[in-house]
Amino acid sequence: MTMFNKVVKEFQWGGHKVRMETGEIARQASGAVLLDMDDTVVLATVVGAKNPKPGQDFFPLTVDYLEKTYAAGKIPGGFFKREGRPSENETLTSRLIDRPLRPLFPEGFYNEVQVVIHVLSINPEVPADIPALVAASAALAVSGLPFNGPVGAARVGYKDGQYLLNPNRAQLAHSDLDLVVAGTERAVLMVESEAQQLSEEIMLGAVVYGHEQMQIAINAIHDLVRDGGKPEWDWQAAPKNEALVAKVSELGLADLQAAYQLRQKSARSQKLKEVYKSVAAKLAEAGVEADGVEVDNILFELESKIVRGQILNGEPRIDGRDTRTVRPIEIRSSVLPRAHGSSLFTRGETQALVVAALGTKSDEQIIDALQGEYRDRFMLHYNMPPFATGETGRVGSPKRREVGHGRLAKRALIPVLPPADEFGYTIRLVSEITESNGSSSMASVCGGSLALMDAGVPIKAHVAGVAMGLILEDNKFAVLTDILGDEDHLGDMDFKVAGTDAGITALQMDIKVQGITKEIMQVALAQAKEGRLHILGKMQAAMGGARTELSEHAPRMITVKINPEKIRDVIGKGGSTIQALTKETGCTIDIGEDGTITIASTSSEGMAEAKRRIEGITAEAEVGKIYNGTVLKLLDFGAIVNILPGKDGLLHISEIANERVNQVSDYVKEGQAVRVKLLSTDEKGRMRLSIKAAKAEEGDVPVAAPQAPGAGDAASQQQQQQQQ
């Protein structure tokens, strides 16, 4: 008799075998599911507070995705030998899981909910994000919490005209698409993707295909809940105070409508604050007892109805535009004099200062992932300080939102970057958001494309991004191009599309309601393309192509190819040679395992000197060639002469002059520069040199008579004895 009431469900999903179980591990959590997808094993747990905190006016959901190094059979680095702060991938995956789960909790549910997903085992070929999302959904479903799920998810690839379901890492490396889609049985809720300039039709097809295939996982979760789920919570939303709603509407509706006739964000925000304060004061004067949070929520609902109603009725949007118009755009390049590339991209009240810096291979980011260590030559960092929205706040390490926006912009630009063998620089872009009123991540894409071209990075084409919104009510809907911050909060869907004039490079969708059909998404994508092409036209007019010359402040780069066996000679004992080269020439020198040496410096003279010295260190001595040598040591039967760095040979006494030489020191001295010809090299690399042969070949003296038989053999024997 076991102490566990374990329920297990197994199913085949594409090329993967999946096993879900509940009832054995983490039984004190509200819900827990262990999911195994071809040896990638994740444990998802959910805990929900039984009661909300007093005064709580928002839904406090936290999602934490945590990777354990033991999952890959590793011990963490560093002094403490344990996992530290979340990596960028953990942060991004936490956001990926949060986004489709959050809209499925009922309105008015303010109990704290924490979802924690641990990666316990990793198959390097099976990414853990899809198993983690499905496991989190299953844990919520079995917990009994008020949750309108379950949610399914799928990764979709695209190659040779075919969609791939949950491709492994090897397949993803050659796929033209990496798209993650999540949703319920009836609707898509979230899309995250990177693409190689694909058409809207292919992208939409991938979303539909992924939604169809995720039903397998959703059905398995239903089976798990049926056999292993906990009782559903008896939770009901608090009834609306209709009398208070009517009173607040009476006091504030007209003023709110007037506020939304103000086109400038700062003036509108100020007016809205005044309305909120005024309504609270009037309620107090009238003797109406009301919770401030409840009043604010009613006013926000009124705002939403005003904005949505105006748009659906065909009236102008908040800032006076129609639904298809992009805000005015201003572009300026080479903004910063010492930066390698920079641009200032302004679209309405959203502005991004994007700066490019070029570095060498040693500047690449080394990422120690569960799947193994790898290097990243392209970084994009997004920062949005509080002053961008006219507020005060914390300034410091990036928050989840900043990390996510930076990754989206990076995804959009990766497909147009030149390969490393054509442009060997490490590239870092930093987007500093200096103003924000919606769509700052897409401003980062546009500004990033311009900054790359300004830096002389030969990208394939400009990339532009546009943020879209959608409002759906009954059978009416409106798609909004280039949404404002307020439209983002009040709409039913926001999606961001980035790409070139040839196709989409990145797509991100977040859908807050169910009922958005394939046809609606088709209209939205077509309108987004129209907006993207408009922005691309502005960017093309401002900068038609990448600069042909790098900034004078950017490092120049040359490459030298050497025999890989010579790498140790360039490095030297304990790194002494490479350190001396770097210090004396002022260059950065990177050595690849294949023998490719990259020399970078802002000084062309320093690069030339470093190249000359490396070629000297690695040069192979050629028989029959004449060299400038230096006498290192005198011997009774000749001298040791250095002809190349680390290359010494024997100048036999018989090869010094045509006449008989009795005393070597009568002809050469230690430290003397001499011209010598390499006569031969034996199987051990020992070299025979000749001054008289060099002079004869260069015309200084007649060609010497052939050497007597056996003389060469005697000299060779003497050289061997000396070097041994």
From Swiss-Prot:
Residues 701-724 have a biased composition (Low complexity). It comes from Ralstonia pickettii (strain 12J). GO terms for molecular function: 3'-5'-RNA exonuclease activity; magnesium ion binding; polyribonucleotide nucleotidyltransferase activity; RNA binding. This is Polyribonucleotide nucleotidyltransferase. Its cofactor is Mg(2+). It catalyses: RNA(n+1) + phosphate = RNA(n) + a ribonucleoside 5'-diphosphate. Its main location: cytoplasm. CDD domains: KH-I_PNPase, RNase_PH_PNPase_1, RNase_PH_PNPase_2, S1_PNPase.
